[in-house]
Amino acid sequence: MVVNRALLASVDALSRDEQIELVEHINGNLAEGMHISEANQALIEARANDTDDAHWSTIDDFDKRIRARLG
């Protein structure tokens, strides 16, 4: 899986509500036939659904946790 660091940084900078809104927007676009890679969608959803912010202190921490989940 290729991790898009710019995407990770952008998503990580969003508030929890903004992250959830982004996931809903992505899901809506997918339903309409627009293509967003499954890996990028999984990264965004995992970040929006994670409530343990202590583990999200850096992009590298985020990368490691997502890779472990999708592994």
Swiss-Prot record:
One of its GO terms (molecular function) is toxin sequestering activity. The keyword ATP-binding does not apply. Keywords: Toxin-antitoxin system. One of its GO terms (biological process) is detoxification. It comes from the Bacteria. Antitoxin component of a type II toxin-antitoxin (TA) system. Upon expression in E.coli neutralizes the effect of cognate toxin ParE2. This is Antitoxin ParD2.
